[in-house]
Amino acid sequence: MSEIQRYLQLEISQQQNFLYPLIFQEYIYAFAHDRSFSKSILLENTGYENKFSLLIVKRLITRMYQQNPFIIFPNDSTQNQFFGHNKNFYSPLISEGFAVIVEIPFFIPLIPSLERKKTKIVKSKNLRSIHSIFPFLEDSFSHLNFVLDILISHSVHAEILVQTLRYWVKDASSLHLIRFLLNEYCNWNSFFILKKGSFCFSKRNQRLFLFLYNSHVWEYESIFFFLRNQSSHLESTYSRVLLERISLYGKIEYFVNVFGKVKDFQVNLWLVKDPCMHYVRYQRKSILASRGTSIFITKWKCFLVTFWQWHFSLWFHPRRIYINQLSKTLLEIWGYLSSVQINPSVVRSQILENSFLITNAIKKLDMLVPIIPLIASLANTKFCNVLGHPISKPIRADLSDSHIIGRFGRICRNLSHYHSGSSKKKSLYRIKYILRLSCARTLARKHKSTVRTFLKKSGSKLLEEFLMSEEDVLFLTFPKALSIFGVVYKSRIWYLDILCISDLVNYK
């Protein structure tokens, strides 16, 4: 770690020319291995000296440049003929180390700004929570009218990824190496899946995948930072830091060509400038909401498609960008169905002998549980059928009843915890019912009896932990909340401790 810190303290001119030698430094791969191990409790720590050896890295890169396809190892039929080693072994090796190296130039522009401002980055776990975005949506989206629902494609050509990194990584040798790796990964079908000349990311090599994908997406998202600074009178520190790039300002000069050749740049900028524009990206989707009219949001759609296509080599089919009215559509956001509902409120006002009825329309963001996708997910993991009827889940015979109940209970509590912000709890109750009855049928199947006979024989105490409702959990946490529970439980609750969504497939 100290070697990397000393490297970050070099001058920018030196940093741009010494990325490639870092590939041969053993501490880079040890650092990458330690970071990967610290994030996963399922990995077996066998020691990085057996996997991330400097000698292995040098031999790997030497064979890459020799390009001898006639190397055959009779002892290992699964070895790749080009590299002479197992692709499952070298794929994470070179990708994890290279991801750490190419991330270095992205941190360089942040260092001078933080030193000038003498600011410290405050790490807050609450801001990392998935639920932290929902209060923002409740405060902002209720005042907006239209939204652009953009479906981001994972299919990216390898050369586009290299060109994206070219603005940040000035080392030509590193760019040639990553271009070579992408082409070879295509042949391996381990890092990318080739589809009609483009690359689709697979689930392997997550670190390098996230880096390439986020850098590519941020490249065309950078236009929103510029427009936000032009529309807002408040200074954005991080936007100003990220905009210190020559490539972006060069592309901004072409705004005039999008809407016509007008000499006044501010006139063209006014066509797409909106102080109430909000942008949110999540998974493979991004949302651009505005308070403008339908004509304004249509101009935005045409602008984005044209600008991204001509200046970022990014093709967005117009049919992948949907214009929706918030009050008439349901948006899928992080496992919720959200829409803006208009609730009329009638107020009676009386002045002397005259009385008036005033009707006010109050907009409120409504969050619903997507019952159909959840049932489909439960059906895929064999908790129920496609119609939502609970079924028994095949399990190992050596598992105890308490272990089975604990697994079902954790899944039920996780779903209840995550979907606690739903405004209507009826769909959530149905999911709980499916899991509870599936647990009972699984235990009855294990004991070779019926559900009624098993529950009557075991008693209600057996499922007491699993059947513990949210009311009991709230009472145990806040004993004084009994009097106000009727109001609290029906309202939406956002938890700031949810960092990821548990996958039901992990149930075995």
From Swiss-Prot:
One of its GO terms (biological process) is RNA splicing. It holds the Pfam family MatK_N. Its main location: plastid. It is found in: Plastid, Chloroplast. One of its GO terms (cellular component) is chloroplast. InterPro entries: Domain_X, Maturase_MatK, Maturase_MatK_N. GO terms for molecular function: RNA binding. Keywords: Chloroplast, mRNA processing, Plastid, RNA-binding, tRNA processing. Belongs to the intron maturase 2 family. MatK subfamily. Usually encoded in the trnK tRNA gene intron. Probably assists in splicing its own and other chloroplast group II introns. This is Maturase K. The lineage of its organism: Eukaryota, Viridiplantae, Streptophyta, Embryophyta, Tracheophyta.
